[in-house]
Each structure stands twice: as C-alpha cells, then as structure tokens.
Amino acid sequence: MRGNGVGAKFGKVAVLLGGTSAEREVSLMSGGAVLAALQAAGVDAHGFDPAQQDLHILKEQGFDRAFIALHGRGGEDGTVQGLLELLKIPYTGSGVMASALAMDKWRTKMVWAACGLPTPRYAILAGDTDWEAVVAELGLPIFVKPVHEGSSMGATKVTAASQLKAAWERAARFDDLVLAEEFIVGAELTVPFLAERALPVIRIEAPGGKYDYQNKYFTDETRYLCPSGLPAEQEQALQALVMKSARALGCRGWGRADLMLTGDGRPYLLEMNTSPGMTGHSLVPMAAKAVGLDFTALCLAILEDARLG
C-alpha cells in the first residue's frame, strides 16, 4: 500500500513503540499518537513493539523507514539506532553516538563542561560514598537521579545529608550509576529543537515545584507556559545555548533540552532528550504548535529527516 503523495514519499514506515524500559507506558502513548497521525496523513505506517517482535524482521517485511518513539534504555540509548544502521533502515532522531551519549547524564555533563557550557556541579554516588563530603561539595538541596533513566524515574530531591543514602538506594534500583547534582533554584524550562531550529522556550510550573513522572504525564495540574513570558532577547539566548548543547553532543533531527534559569538570569543545562515524549502532555508538540506546526505536520517533519549515519 504505497499509494501516492505522502505515502509514496515515505514508503512503509515502522513506528517503534513500547519496548522494555521503565518508560514503556509513556512510549506506548507516544507511539500510538504518532502512528495515528501518520496514518491519518496517508502514510503506510505500522506499529512495531520491540518487546514483542524481533527488530530484524523489519527488513524482511519491507520497511523503508523507522520512526523511533521509544523512550529510555533499548530505544533512546543508541542500541536500536545501531541495529537500524546494520539493517540499513533510515530512522528518526540522533545517531548511535549522540543517542548513547545523551542517555548518559554523567558523560553529557562532562562534554558540556568541557565545551564551556553551563551545567550544575555534580558527583557520582556509590555505596561507600562519603555523604557528608558530597554535601560539602554540592551544598543542599541535592538532586539524585539514575544516570541512564528519563522521565524523572528514580529521582529524589535531598534536603539533608542523612537522606542521601536512601536517595542513592532508590536511584540504584534503576541504574548502577547514580548522579548527585547541585540543586538549582529558579524557573524550570525546556527548549525543543527541530532540525537546526530551536523551537520556543516552554516554562514549566508543576504542583509544589515537583516536576516528576506523575506530574509529567498523568496530571492536568502542571502548567506549561508557551510563550514563556521571557524577554525576546533572553529567549533567543536560551535557544542559541540549546543548539550549542545539541551540537556538542552530535544530536540531530529533533530533541529537547531541559534547563534551569536562576533569578539573576543564569541558565544551567540539565539533560538532553533525543527521543522526547509525543503524548497529550508532551512539550515538543506544544512548542511546534506555537510556530504553526500541528501534531501531524510535526510528525511528518521528523519522519522526513530520517536518515542513516
């Protein structure tokens, strides 16, 4: 069913969704929304869950492109990207190296710091860590999170040294590597990008200032402000910073950087997401809409940029 127009342009498309990571539930929502939009636009798109089918059969079944709507390990960390490279099936988003690097919050911060880009101070935690020394180095509060998880999985805000070990234990259930990060007080922002263009800044106001997994995906109480209300010059500076941060990691196609902005106007890069959510609560579609791209147009733009290498 190649058809004409859009269908012929993209060929047979696999929307990769679900997977086996801790973010499976969100990925199913993201992939379902993308799949519906592509099909409505006339694309010969099919849902494909790597947790239920072997990805090698994508080639056997004649797929021409893959839209990666997987989140977390196994989908956002370079592994799926590497397999698609071997199968020679062009895919959306960043390549193998950038996907793996951005998924690793520790090494992402090392690259940004080496490039002179602002990111909060940090330390790696282990069972034998001197908790008091970490507090002396980073101050309080401290944000503790797994190095390789997204959607705030296993993350804890620590307000006393006595809480650090429990926070480490919680994060360590998700990952062998656990990051302690200086807690930055200020406005929580996110800046998506599409191709070489930064989209509008979004300001996030979560209930109680807690933008966790629940408040990201399953509540209507979190407020997302787009336009952000920032002065135009400041917004442009933040967009430029995000594009620098993406280029430093080798990101391409689309993505989203999370950052904090202090009261005196200093930005701090937190994380880079190379396969952001595409749910009803997601932020890339919101920013795209602000510049005239509806959800379907956004999905088509991302798919059009699918490539190898």
UniProtKB/Swiss-Prot annotation:
Catalytic activity: 2 D-alanine + ATP = D-alanyl-D-alanine + ADP + phosphate + H(+)
A biological process from GO: cell wall organization
This protein's record includes keyword Ribosomal protein: no
Family, as annotated: Belongs to the D-alanine--D-alanine ligase family.
GO molecular function: ATP binding; D-alanine-D-alanine ligase activity; metal ion binding
Signal peptide range in chain numbering: none
Needed co-factor(s): Mg(2+); Mn(2+)
Organism classification: Bacteria, Pseudomonadati, Pseudomonadota, Betaproteobacteria, Rhodocyclales
Location of the protein in the cell: Cytoplasm
Residues binding ATP: 135-190
Pfam families the record matches: Dala_Dala_lig_C, Dala_Dala_lig_N
EC number: 6.3.2.4
Swiss-Prot/TrEMBL keywords: ATP-binding, Cell shape, Cell wall biogenesis/degradation, Cytoplasm, Ligase, Magnesium, Manganese, Metal-binding, Nucleotide-binding, Peptidoglycan synthesis
Function: Cell wall formation.
Cofactor note: Binds 2 magnesium or manganese ions per subunit.
Known pathway: Cell wall biogenesis; peptidoglycan biosynthesis
Name the record gives this protein: D-alanine--D-alanine ligase
